[in-house]
A protein has these predicted regions:
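C-terminal lid/capping helical subdomain adjacent to the catalytic/cofactor pocket in oxidative enzymes
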Residues: 118, 122-170
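A generic structural signal for short beta-strands and their flanking turns/coil linkers
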Residues: 31-33
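Active-site lid/adjacent beta-loop-alpha segment flanking the redox-cofactor pocket in flavoenzymes
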Residues: 20-28, 37-127
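Short, glycine-/Ser/Thr-/acidic-enriched flexible segments
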Residues: 13, 70, 136
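Predominant activation on well-ordered alpha-helical scaffold segments within soluble catalytic domains
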Residues: 15-18, 87, 147-150
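Glycine-rich phosphate-binding loop signature in dinucleotide/nucleotide-binding domains
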Residues: 1-2
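Flavin (primarily FAD) binding-site architecture
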Residues: 5-24
Length: 170
């Protein structure tokens, strides 16, 4: 496949590819867990327990329990300790139904040392563009990051100052 322009938007896997191309972007992974429980108690609003480090969110078919984050490599096996403690604390607060999925969801959130995404032209390769490193805000920032990158690629005036996100800052 040939292309004059290529976007690297590989989340936590961007580091491995870009290292081979000579880039040393300090990207690390924070990992979090979610578990989905059938309706036990009725929950109409999200509940955040900052002391125990978890959040409960109502869903159409149950309740989603999510935890904070842990530092782990992409290949590290799951560590269910955090999720187990959060589930125990949540069950003291309200009656969670049985867990819907056999295995909880585990997500790797790509983070840079300054906690800002990497968006813009690659400094070493013409036609190579970056859009990754959004940490916990990947779904939230995805649309506006895509817009910013498209504006940069098209030579248009960007919606925001792209300098804080420039790949060359590392």
């Amino acid at each position: 496949v040939g292309a004059s322009e290529v976007v690297v938007a590989l989340g936590p896997w961007a580091h491995e590819l870009l290292f081979e191309l000579g880039y040393r972007i300090p990207l690390f992974v924070k990992r979090g867990y979610h578990a989905h429980f059938a309706d036990g108690a009725m929950l109409t609003r999200p509940v955040l327990d900052t002391e125990q480090g978890y959040m409960l969110a109502p869903m159409k078919r149950g309740i989603r329990l999510s935890t904070g984050a842990e530092f782990a490599s992409l290949s590290a096996p799951p560590t269910p300790v955090q999720l187990g403690k959060a589930e125990s604390a949540a069950r003291q607060l309200l009656a969670l139904g049985p867990q819907v999925e056999r295995m909880p969801w585990k997500g790797a959130r790509p983070c840079t040392v300054d906690m800002k995404p990497v968006i813009g032209a690659a400094p070493l390769h013409k036609g190579l563009w970056f859009n990754f490193g959004h940490a916990h805000q990947g779904f939230t920032l995805g649309p506006v990051s895509g817009r910013l990158l498209a504006e940069l690629m098209m030579g248009e005036t960007p919606i925001v100052d792209p300098a804080p996100f420039a790949p060359g800052r590392f």
